[in-house]
Amino acid sequence: YHGDVASGRYFSRMLGRYMAASAHFRDVGMVIPVPLHWRRRWKRGYNQAEIIAAEIARELGAEMRCDLLARVRSTGTQTKMSVDEKSANVKGAFEVRDRKKLQELTEVGHILLLDDVFTTGNTLFACFQALRIVFPPSVRISVVTLGFVDGA
């Protein structure tokens, strides 16, 4: 937050250690961070979800993949939007980059989809829908965030 990458890494490692100790996450084979649109990434210089995902993947012994999911439409900031506006804002904003490549990865039994903050769940749900098109129901997709905004 505000460029404090060290704190983000620290809290991400703590969450990753907690998750690694849980039977619910021991079988995670891949961690996928929610992508930023390329313009926002360029402006900010980094994707905080990737930083969090890297630490959690390391603690879980899982592979982190930033190349599989893309934000194909700039959605703008959602901080002042209503729940319905947020839902409409992210609908169709995410796509699988290379379906063939992803289909080759279907031996992964459990994917962890990660975002930095959870408000309404619309962003994570839009990403989940994009991944579910490619991955069969036998592949479990869990979600995790480092933060939660109440009353969004």
Predicted regions and their residues:
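Conserved PRPP/pyrophosphate-binding segment of the phosphoribosyltransferase/PRPP-pathway fold
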Residues: 1-113, 120-152
